[in-house]
Design a protein with these regions (language model features):
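Surface beta-strand/loop "capping" patches
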Residues: 138-141
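Substrate-binding/catalytic cleft of secreted carbohydrate-active enzymes
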Residues: 1-134
Length: 141
């Protein structure tokens, strides 16, 4: 990309990543190594702080499965924990933003069961298990 060929004006680098969701779907064990390597590669290339501006997994509120499988609340919690672990291991990560705060309506599709369900809260603003995991994460910081 010619815009990035001279990174003089580039202050920070932002990426959206969905390892184990859109890439390697359902393979939770791929998140940490793939996210960590991706973050390190971008940082090595541009030598700038990185913000992960999107990461998330669709979850049907109330769906529980062990071992965790896609769309279960347990999967979303583990998904977020593995991404957080990768980001926390890189001191150049300047921020992160879960996609999304709450579920919202979108067009229908194979990956859109009654809207986007990547929220840590439902459309009615009721917490999913992930909301409690994220609360715990930030209270411990």
């Amino acid at each position: 990309c010619s815009v990035l060929s001279n990174n003089y004006w580039l202050m920070i680098f932002c990426i959206n990543r969905y390892f184990s969701w859109y890439i390697c779907t359902g393979r939770i064990e791929t998140i940490y190594p793939m996210m960590k390597k991706d973050l390190e590669d971008w940082h090595a290339k541009y030598h700038k702080p990185v913000i992960v501006t999107e990461y998330g997994a669709d979850t049907i509120a109330g769906m529980h499965k062990l071992p965790e499988v896609i769309f279960s609340e347990e999967y979303q919690v583990t998904y977020l924990e593995e991404n957080n672990r990768a980001m926390d291991s890189c001191d150049f990560v300047a921020g992160e933003h879960i996609w999304a705060f709450a579920d919202f309506m979108t067009s229908f599709g194979l990956r859109r069961i009654d809207g986007n369900k990547k929220g840590i809260f439902t459309r009615q603003r009721q917490p999913k298990a992930a909301a409690f995991a994220i609360r715990k994460r930030w209270l411990e910081k």
